[in-house]
């Protein structure tokens, strides 16, 4: 019933010209109301064809423009009517026009709306292309199906983008957490260095104090005894001077000689300006070295060993490990480091598979538990030719070798170019290594022509650095396990 009342009210406030709810309603003297735009257009048309005669479009009663009045009462009704919602039952009647109550059978192409036959004849849809819904449903079904497929593709792309950003987010989190772990570990190493230096310095000072105080205590005891001896002599002389003549002269010459010959012994002292003065560790140098290693590790490359046909070298299946097959080797001078390497040493040397022709490259080699090894970089060699060499003359920078090595478990050395007197034998320089490295880092800066070796076991301290290297051709990582059967292992960047 309420719906019927609403429909009746709608009819009363519907413009007779456009068949829409009144917009800015104006009422004529006859009582009929129209939209302001509709009555104005009608007025202009009347002026064109009827020579100034104006009449109501409904009842044809003439009117004067000055008699047209805004109808605020009707405007308020229209406004309230627009706010009113239909009942659920009425809302379910989707197949009928909400404005006219007629069945929805047509489709307006311009407005893309389903309309009734009265809507088609209204001012809103006049001149538009309209079709029966059955005529266009299949066409738009195909279009919507195509649009649906496009949306599904977009959905897949959106899901992939979502997955990519999540993966990148997770990757960044892992990377930064890894960097945080490295920072904590690096600074923990620095603290260990400082703690060790502090402990060593305090121990040295404590030992110095014990030694000095022990020596001074002995001197103090002797000085106390010497003072007591002088006091006793003084007491004896005072007693003689106060006694009888016989007591005065009895053994007087002996006493006088003892006093004249007596020499006071001076205590052993320590000059403060000659003692060892404590100096704080070179923290700047330590930090510079730490930064150098940190910078080098940014260029860590995953080195693997190149296949070879050398009979004395055994390369593991993963191409990261090399060991010596035959430990038997004879030295002409067993007590002299690296002075009589036989061709066996060359036959156990292997190259990394990656050539270095530019840029910066870093890798680490595990040499733990080995008593002998040689490592660094090499400008390449022919295996067969190398095995025919009976001496170690090729271990020189001028022949393309920038290497350091270990012999007899404790002797570390670096190979330099031979002197003018011995040009064919390398000049072997002993290296001072406080803590034996279980892991050695190698850093090559091709443009700077440098090769650096770091003791990773000892907080990355620099072992040795080749400068002004003449890289005239590609160089390769070089590993030589020598006579020791314990393998050398290339460490992965993630280790």
Curated annotation (Swiss-Prot):
Zn finger spans (RING-type): 15-60
Modified residues (N-acetylalanine): 2
Keyword list, A-Z: Acetylation, Antiviral defense, Autophagy, Coiled coil, Cytoplasm, Immunity, Innate immunity, Metal-binding, Nucleus, Phosphoprotein, Transferase, Ubl conjugation, Ubl conjugation pathway, Zinc, Zinc-finger
Modified residues (Phosphoserine): 87
Cellular component, GO, one term: P-body
Coiled-coil regions listed: 137-225
Catalytic function, reaction form: S-ubiquitinyl-[E2 ubiquitin-conjugating enzyme]-L-cysteine + [acceptor protein]-L-lysine = [E2 ubiquitin-conjugating enzyme]-L-cysteine + N(6)-ubiquitinyl-[acceptor protein]-L-lysine
PTM field: Degraded in a proteasome-independent fashion in the absence of viral infection but in a proteasome-dependent fashion following exposure to restriction sensitive virus. Autoubiquitinated in a RING finger- and UBE2D2-dependent manner. Monoubiquitinated by TRIM21. Deubiquitinated by Yersinia YopJ. Ubiquitination may not lead to proteasomal degradation.
Protein name: Tripartite motif-containing protein 5
């Amino acid at each position: 019933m309420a719906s019927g009342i609403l429909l009746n009210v709608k009819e009363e406030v519907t413009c007779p010209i456009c068949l829409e709810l009144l917009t800015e309603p104006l009422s004529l003297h006859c009582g009929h109301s129209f939209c302001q735009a509709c009555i104005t257009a009608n007025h202009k048309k009347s002026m064109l064809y009827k020579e100034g005669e104006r009449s109501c479009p409904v009842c044809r009663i003439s009117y004067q423009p000055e008699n047209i009045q805004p109808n605020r009462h009707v405007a308020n009704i229209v406004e309230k009517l627009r706010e009113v919602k239909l009942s659920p039952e009425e809302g379910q009647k989707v197949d009928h026009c909400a404005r006219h109550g007629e069945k929805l059978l047509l489709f307006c192409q311009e407005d893309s709306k389903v309309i009734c036959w009265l809507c088609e004849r209204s001012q809103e849809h006049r001149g538009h292309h309209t079709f029966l819904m059955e005529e266009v449903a299949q066409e738009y079904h195909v279009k919507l199906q195509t649009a649906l497929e496009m949306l599904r593709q977009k959905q897949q792309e959106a899901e992939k983008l979502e997955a990519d950003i999540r993966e990148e987010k997770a990757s960044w989190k892992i990377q930064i957490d890894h960097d945080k772990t490295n920072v904590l570990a690096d600074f923990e190493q620095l603290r260990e260095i400082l703690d060790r230096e502090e402990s060593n310095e305090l121990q040295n000072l404590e030992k110095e104090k014990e030694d000095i105080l022990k020596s001074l205590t002995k001197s103090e005891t002797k000085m106390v005894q010497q003072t007591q001896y002088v006091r006793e002599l003084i007491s004896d002389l005072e007693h003689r001077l106060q006694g009888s003549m016989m007591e005065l002269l009895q053994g007087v010459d002996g006493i006088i000689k003892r006093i004249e010959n007596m020499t006071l012994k001076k205590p052993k002292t320590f000059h403060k300006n000659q003692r060892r003065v404590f100096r704080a560790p070179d923290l700047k140098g330590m930090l510079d070295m730490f930064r150098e290693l940190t910078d080098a590790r940014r260029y860590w490359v995953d080195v693997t060993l190149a296949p070879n046909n050398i009979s004395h070298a055994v390369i593991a299946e993963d191409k990261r490990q090399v060991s010596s097959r035959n430990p038997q080797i004879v030295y002409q001078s067993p007590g002299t480091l690296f002075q009589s390497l036989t061709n066996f040493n060359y036959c156990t040397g292997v190259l990394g598979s990656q050539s270095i022709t530019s840029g910066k490259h870093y890798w680490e080699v595990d040499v733990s538990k080995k008593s002998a090894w040689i490592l660094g970089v090499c400008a390449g060699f022919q295996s067969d030719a190398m095995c025919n060499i009976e001496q170690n003359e090729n271990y020189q920078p001028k022949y393309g070798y920038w290497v350091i090595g270990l012999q007899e478990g404790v002797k570390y050395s670096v190979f330099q170019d031979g002197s003018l007197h011995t040009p064919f034998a390398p000049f072997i320089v002993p290296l001072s290594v406080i803590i034996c490295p279980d892991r050695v880092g190698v850093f090559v800066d091709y443009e700077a022509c440098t090769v650096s070796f770091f003791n990773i076991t000892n907080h990355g301290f620099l072992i040795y650095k080749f400068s002004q290297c003449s890289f005239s051709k590609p160089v390769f990582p070089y590993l030589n396990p020598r006579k020791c059967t314990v393998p050398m292992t290339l460490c992965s960047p993630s280790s």
